[in-house]
Amino acid sequence: MGKDEGIPVRVALRCRPLVPKENNEGCKMCLTFVPGEQQVIVGTEKSFTYDYVFDPSAEQEEVYNSAVAPLIKGLFKGYNATVLAYGQTGSGKTYSMGGAYTHNQENEPTVGVIPRTVIALFREIHQRPEWEFNLKVSYLEIYNEEILDLLYAARDKTNTISIREDPKEGIKICGLTERDVKTALDTLSCLEQGNSSRTVASTAMNSQSSRSHAIFTISIEQRKEGDKNNSFRSKLHLVDLAGSERQKKTKAEGDRLKEGISINRGLLCLGNVISALGDESKKGGFVPYRDSKLTRLLQDSLGGNSHTLMIACVSPADSNMEETLNTLRYADRARKIKNKPIVNTDPQAAELQRLKLQVQELQVLLLQAHGGTLPVLNSMEPSENLQSLMERNKNLEKENGKLSRELGEAAVQTAQFLEKIIMTEQQNEKLGSKMEELKQHAACKVNLQRLVETLEDQELKDNVEVIQNLQQVIVQLQDESSGIAGSIEAMDEEAASFPVPEEDSGEKRSSDGFTTNHALRQAQLSKELIELNKALVMKEALAKKMAQNDRQLEPIQSEYLNNIKHLESEVGVLQKEKEELILALHSAKKDNNQAKLSERRRKRLQELEGQMTELKKKLGEQSKLLKLRESTEKTVAKMNQEIQGMKMQRVQLMRQMKEDAEKFRTWKQQKTKEVIQLKEKDRKRQYELLKLERDFQKQANVLRRKTEEAASANKRLKEALQRQKEAMEKRKDSQSKGMEGAASRVKNWLANEVEVLVSTEEAQRHLNDLLEDRKILAQDIAQLKQKTDAGERIPTKIRRRTYTVAELENLEEEASVTKQIESLETEMELRSAQIADLQQKLLDADGEEEMVKRRWETISNIMEAKCALKYLITELVSSKVAGSKLESSVKQNRAHVADLQKNIFEERNQMAEMETEHQSQLMQLEQHHQEKILYLLSQLQQKQASVPVTIEELPAEEITEREKQLMERLKFQDEEIEKMKALCEKNQQLLQENDMYKQKLALLHVASGKKLHNILPAAEICSPDSPFDFIPPKPRGKRRTNAKSAAVILEDLLSESESEEESDDKNWEPGNNSKQSKKLTSKCSCKARCGNKMCGCRKTKQNCSDDCFCDPSKCRNRDNHMDEGKHEDQSLESENSKIDYPDVTAGGSFFTPPCVTPTKKVLREISDIGQVLSIKLQRKPSTASASASVMESQENQTSILTKKKKVLCNSNTSFFSGCSAITEDE
């Protein structure tokens, strides 16, 4: 038994709670559930309504009892059923369906739909002992568009499975394993076996993600024990679909990516099928079931023979809002699908039942055909028989038509007469009732004759006589009405006795069906009306007679009542007398003398009993008469009700006859009008025929004038062509004008649409960035909370935003862990609010599906479509040109940056080579210089030791030769110094060029907004020939050190502002000595030991001199204290000379190889010795004290130089030792 109307697919929405991962990422709920309503709201405005809605607090049992349990009862009635779960990956489909069931979960509340369905199915089977059941189960999965048997023993072997379509049984799967099951335990073991074989893998969104679609099918065959023909077949499909996923969220690669593509392809085909079935405009159109194996297997479940329930599983997290919205729309379209389930009976039993019905129908037809034979006239030949029958048929049709018309007219007349009769009867009834009222009036009961005799006033006598005359008139009218009623009754009896002729069934056919039917119907209604009138008259007469009898019984009834009372009193008296006689008889039995008296009393008693019996009989008869009257009254009341009903029925019949007559009149008028129109058409055709004949006669004349008309026709043709050309030009002008207006309108519309779509995409990109930022914030908060719980001290984390150094220092000093967590949570709430606002705007921009569908309805004709296409092509070409320009400019910029970088590398390499060469030259010069100084010192000591005389005592030749030698040496030293200055200046120029290139590179980085590694390949950034690691500069708020290139300037080396305690200056940098040269004239006046920076000389990094006002014996900033602090100075030099330079690695810096460079103090002392010697040569001392002081100073300087030489020789550090790379904070 099929159902005429389709049953919609039911949809249940289930929302899972937020998982810990989503909580850790700071996700918020984006779904709102309306209490008491099956409705869910996405964001703030967009709402969806489904058959069932389950919020995150709903348990498995509630979902099953509300949505799935009603389908189980239909299975035992022969209907198929399907339950399928759809949703995003990780939304709870497998959990809801029980796709991961094991025997350990048997009694747990988390058991899904499939195990609960199996248990309920077998529970229902046990409650039907009069039926025999045969159950089979199968379990398959669709993995990468291949059907795999999950119950097949050896899944490694190829098991050929194909899909076939049976027109009677629907979709069948050939080669699939089906197992017979007897109990729920057997079925659940098959389910567990299939679950263990199902393909499952881990993704970034779900650790146990189903990678295939799974279908668990239970086939049920039920047959009644006593009736083999009463059997049903049904199937239950339990479908666990794989979740839709996005690669950027699942991070799928390799096989997982291929699986995800296959899953999305199958779900896309399923969505196309749902859209085709749910779209009312495409109803009856093509449905792409064959695009996927999943849709072919679900062909009966979607739009076919099945009761279907779809469980849409969604995630409430706002990070998955787009997927959730797609799922809700998907489910909303599924609600529009109409299935047509039918009862699946046994084919043999159904065929047998169909044949039985067919036999019954044939038997009825056979009876209607009078045994299946028609009368045939055997006395005539077949041709004569047919001809006579045709003639007879025509005659009968004519006669039938005539009789039908007459019958119709008679019926109309009868209806009119009956209507008049009814009205007359109504008036008669009214008059009769008034006559009865007058008759019952008190004036009619007065004896007027006696009253006339007694009255004396003549006027009163006249009035009484008038009243007496009126009484006589009333009596006469009553007699006349009774006579008319009697004659009417006699006429009715005669009409009833008149025989009604039987109708010939063979002559009922008429030529005009509608007229005949109308006449017959009017005749039938008239007949019914006449019969109704007869019955009504009879009943009215009977009711009147019964009423008269009742009125006649009224005095008898009163008399009977009085008699009954009298008899009852007599019976009472006799009863008392009887009781007294009985008592007297009992007393007489005791006395023998009163025998005669007792005998008389006994006789009297018998007489009394006889009288009492007669009185009781009379009393009973009179009671029966009273009951008879009561029953007569009830009968009269009932008859009156029937009379009223018959009158109403008569009125309805009259009304119906009037309506039929009016319809027939309207139809007849219409037909008459049509006949008139046809006659008019026929007349016109006759006229046209005559006209054509006249035209034909005129053709000869037309042929004669043919030559003359050729020229005029040619002229008219030219004129027509000219007019046509002008019309075409006008039409083109109007079209061009219209096209321009349409073009501007379409252009503006398309520009607006493109702007909206671009804004939507940008908003989506910003939304993804905000979600990622919130995820990072949630991770930071979780880490801080974990460390807080563990009791660790958390260092202040520097966020990715840019702070100044002072702000960072204040933040490190003042911020605490609690404040950090609170600030992060506030920032995360701000991100969540921005996310919700963006999502709502995206929802508003997206709009309903109908708005998306109506997007192109603005283009209504081909002209607008051409305008739109032209505009889109123009925009596409312009965008392509702009893109190519940008690409070419980017390529040029990259090439330019590469050239600049290459030049920088070359310059750096060249600078490094020059630096190494310069260092080597400096070292060689220093060695030569030291050798010369040592040679001079040795010569000076030897001379002093060998010749203990003064200079004045030396011969002039010797002094001259020595002076010449010293002058030559001084000249040589000056030349070397000039060379060193030139080299230093060249080095300084190279350093300035290097700084300029660095600034250019930094500007390029800021302009491009990209890192160097994104612009140039790695091979260009790090050249194998480069002896150092280049770190690209980044914009910084403030640097700890102003690291400059290590340039050695000769003026600084030779300045006299350096002291032996220069290692104490922690802020010393190369090239800063020019600032210190301004402080040479400072003097101190300390009263202590000059041991701290309160001393002016120590503060300016100078030794105290003789000009200072401090105590020489206590001062520790003089030369005599330097030997004591030698080792301390070395350690201070090695520690405090480290500044924030880039880290120096072996083979990776231009600061290699290490070299020993003299300090400024040594060079200064060397220059002092040269100055002393030059003074000696230029000026000869005049006194011995002067020569003694000079010799003493020479000895002191010699001892100091010897000490410094030992320090330099023992030191393993270079001038640039301790330099480290400047680490740039991210």
From Swiss-Prot:
The record's Gene3D superfamilies line, in alphabetical order, gives:
Kinesin motor domain
| InterPro entries xref list | Kinesin-like_fam, Kinesin_motor_CS, Kinesin_motor_dom, Kinesin_motor_dom_sf, P-loop_NTPase, Tesmin/TSO1-like_CXC
Summary of the function given for this chain in its UniProt record? Iron-sulfur (Fe-S) cluster binding motor protein that has a role in chromosome segregation during mitosis. Required for mitotic chromosomal positioning and bipolar spindle stabilization.
Q: Which PANTHER family match?
A: CHROMOSOME-ASSOCIATED KINESIN KIF4A-RELATED (PTHR47969:SF15)
Tissue specificity, in the record's words, reads:
Expressed in oocytes, eggs, testes and brain.
Biological processes annotated in GO: microtubule-based movement; mitotic spindle organization; spindle elongation
Quick one: where is this thing mainly located?
A: nucleus
Entry GO MF terms? ATP binding; DNA binding; iron-sulfur cluster binding; metal ion binding; microtubule binding; microtubule motor activity
Name the UniProt key words of this record, in alphabetical order.
Answer: ATP-binding, Chromosome, Coiled coil, Cytoplasm, Cytoskeleton, DNA-binding, Iron, Iron-sulfur, Metal-binding, Microtubule, Motor protein, Nucleotide-binding, Nucleus
The subcellular localization recorded is:
Nucleus; Chromosome; Cytoplasm, Cytoskeleton
Entry similarity comment: Belongs to the TRAFAC class myosin-kinesin ATPase superfamily. Kinesin family. Chromokinesin subfamily.
The entry's protein name is Chromosome-associated kinesin KIF4
* Ranges for region Globular: 1007-1226
* Annotated disulfide bonds: none
Native source organism of the sequence: Xenopus laevis
The family database entries (SMART domains) matched by this protein are listed as: CXC, KISc
Q: Where is the composition biased (Acidic residues)?
A: 494-505, 1053-1064
